[in-house]
């Protein structure tokens, strides 16, 4: 078995573990969060899911994303073992590479100190007054920095291809967070509404992740650099890795503005009454993204970077086949969403409760569901682009990010203020923005990789037509249920019935899906 097949197998094992832990933990925490939301006011939930989520993601993303992207191109532990002949050289090379990885990951910690101070100070002076708001800002800042301190352990496990370990740590942290948030919400249900339960839950999550990753990595804790000897000279970092980090920094900043642009605009332009329903829709609508799309994107970054780094035709073909396989599955998930988005009323009624189940919240959730396929496709396409592109092409991507960021904020403000579309306008602006980025990434792939076949990644025309027909049927049912012309039980049971019917047609019509299912159940082997 060659190195690329070994990488695909270890990655597929990690991906299955990641999806399992993300799925099980997210489903468990989903139900706990619904109980917590029922005890929380819309304004308190909006502060937690929008304002404080922006604070934390800004600290984490700007501090570590460019470092993570650069380190995905570093040869794995297994690659070094198989490529080094003598035992003495192997031991020395592994030891040096391990220390370089820990040194490089500490860059995230050092950058995080500065960014944490700047972002927290900005929030202290700009955030609207709310019960325990200053305390929550401090807690979210501290919890973000604790997660940054776990970066050396995370990167060591990634280098060793122990992907299931990182997935376990994140899953356990999520469960602890939900349990503590719910417990504090129950204890403080008679007090003034605040985001404090979510803040303390978030802190417990990051502490859990830190100690779990440290246990799995089995490395001593240190925030100091250690020299590494190389060719009779000593270094702290590999110069080529530093160049890649610098080349990613500009794109990371722009990508963060684009990715969190909707929440930034909701936080600063939308009314407090509109922030709660949008935060809830974002929570529900991105559940599938957090369970499936995020683990797939994270592992795709690693696999694509390793398979395209050495410009080997055989490995490149495996990467392209894997990309086509993922896009194919995403396309069918998107067609499920096409008719499944009409059942948002059921999700709100059984999830957040009747006080959240307004027509406006249901409409926002349906629109957000239509946005998810664009988010999924863009994630895996950009993962391939970032992994395969050279420095000049990464600079071109930065220009694309800048153009799409300007386009997004202008379009969002235009739809939000001039057309008074509110949250619907922001979702539409997001879809238009991601469409531009998808076209940019596809252009790069089609131009540089002639073996990639886009039609192979698309659903069969018959299945697309069937999804549209099922969408019309589900729209008819929800309309007549709201008018009390159809019993709730009929409307409720139609959801799983249509999903099962559509699944059967996919298996019958598309023979590729049957082959992909076998791959998913056994192991990744890309012919």
Swiss-Prot record:
The biological pathway it contributes to is: Protein modification; protein glycosylation
The reply to whether Endoplasmic reticulum figures as a keyword in the UniProt entry is yes
Name the domain of life. Answer: Eukaryota
The transmembrane segments are 42-62, 106-126, 137-157, 167-187, 319-339, 364-384, 402-422, 426-446, 461-481, 488-508
Look up the record and report any one GO term of the cellular component aspect: endoplasmic reticulum
Q: Which UniProt keywords apply?
A: Endoplasmic reticulum, Membrane, Sugar transport, Transmembrane, Transmembrane helix, Transport
Q: Tell me, what is an example of a GO biological process annotation in this record? A: glycolipid translocation
Molecular function in Gene Ontology: glycolipid floppase activity
Q: Where in the cell is it found?
A: Endoplasmic reticulum membrane
Q: How does it sit in the membrane?
A: Multi-pass membrane protein
Q: Which family does it belong to?
A: Belongs to the RFT1 family.
Q: What does this protein do?
A: Intramembrane glycolipid transporter that operates in the biosynthetic pathway of dolichol-linked oligosaccharides, the glycan precursors employed in protein asparagine (N)-glycosylation. The sequential addition of sugars to dolichol pyrophosphate produces dolichol-linked oligosaccharides containing fourteen sugars, including two GlcNAcs, nine mannoses and three glucoses. Once assembled, the oligosaccharide is transferred from the lipid to nascent proteins by oligosaccharyltransferases.
PANTHER family tied to this protein? ENDOPLASMIC RETICULUM MULTISPAN TRANSMEMBRANE PROTEIN-RELATED, PROTEIN RFT1 HOMOLOG
Protein name in the entry: Man(5)GlcNAc(2)-PP-dolichol translocation protein RFT1
Q: Which organism is it from?
A: Schizosaccharomyces pombe (strain 972 / ATCC 24843)
Its taxonomic path starts at:
Eukaryota, Fungi, Dikarya, Ascomycota, Taphrinomycotina
């Amino acid at each position: 078995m060659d190195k690329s097949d070994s990488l695909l197998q270890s990655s597929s094992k990690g991906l299955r573990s990641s999806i399992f832990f993300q799925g099980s933990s997210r489903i468990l925490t989903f139900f706990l969060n619904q109980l917590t939301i029922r005890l929380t006011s819309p304004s308190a939930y909006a502060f937690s899911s929008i304002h404080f989520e922006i604070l934390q993601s800004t600290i984490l993303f700007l501090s570590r994303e460019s470092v993570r992207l650069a380190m995905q191109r570093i040869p794995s532990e297994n690659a070094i073992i198989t490529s080094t002949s003598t035992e003495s050289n192997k031991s020395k090379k592994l030891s040096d590479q391990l220390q370089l990885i820990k040194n490089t990951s500490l860059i995230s910690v050092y950058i995080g100190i500065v960014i944490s101070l700047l972002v927290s100070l900005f929030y202290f002076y700009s955030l609207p007054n709310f019960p325990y708001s200053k305390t929550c800002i401090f807690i979210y800042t501290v919890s973000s920095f604790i997660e940054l301190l776990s970066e050396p352990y995370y990167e060591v496990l990634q280098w060793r291809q122990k992907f299931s370990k990182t997935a376990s740590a994140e899953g356990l942290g999520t469960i602890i967070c939900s349990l503590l948030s719910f417990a504090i919400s129950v204890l403080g249900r008679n007090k003034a509404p605040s985001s404090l339960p979510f803040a303390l839950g978030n802190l417990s999550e990051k502490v859990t992740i830190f100690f779990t990753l440290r246990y799995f990595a089995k490395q001593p804790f240190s925030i100091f650099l250690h020299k590494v000897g190389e060719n009779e000279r000593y270094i702290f970092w590999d110069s080529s890795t530093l160049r890649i980090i610098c080349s990613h920094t500009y794109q990371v900043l722009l990508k963060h503005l684009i990715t969190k642009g909707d929440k930034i605009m909701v936080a600063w332009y939308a009314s407090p009454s509109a922030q709660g329903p949008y935060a809830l829709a974002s929570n529900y609508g991105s559940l599938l993204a957090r369970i499936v799309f995020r683990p797939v994107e994270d592992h795709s970054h690693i696999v694509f970077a390793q398979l395209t780094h050495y410009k080997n035709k055989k490995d490149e073909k495996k990467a392209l086949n894997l990309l086509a396989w993922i896009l194919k599955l995403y396309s069918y998930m998107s067609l499920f969403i096409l008719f499944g988005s009409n059942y948002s009323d059921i999700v709100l009624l059984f999830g957040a409760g009747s006080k959240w189940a307004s027509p406006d919240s249901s409409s926002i959730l349906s629109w957000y569901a239509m946005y998810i396929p664009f988010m999924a496709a863009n994630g895996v396409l950009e993962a391939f682009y970032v992994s395969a592109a050279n420095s000049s092409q990464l600079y071109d991507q930065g220009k694309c990010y800048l153009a799409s960021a300007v386009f997004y904020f202008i379009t969002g403000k235009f739809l939000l203020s001039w057309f008074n579309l509110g949250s619907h306008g922001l979702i539409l602006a997001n879809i238009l923005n991601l469409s531009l980025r998808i076209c940019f990434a596809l252009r790069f792939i089609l131009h540089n990789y002639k073996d990639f076949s886009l039609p192979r990644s698309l659903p069969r025309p018959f299945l697309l037509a069937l999804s549209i027909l099922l969408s019309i049927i589900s729209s008819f049912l929800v309309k007549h249920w709201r008018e009390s012309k159809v019993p709730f039980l009929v409307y409720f049971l139609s959801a799983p019935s249509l999903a099962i019917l559509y699944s059967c047609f996919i298996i019958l019509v598309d023979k590729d899906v049957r082959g992909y299912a076998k791959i998913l159940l056994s192991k990744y082997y890309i012919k």
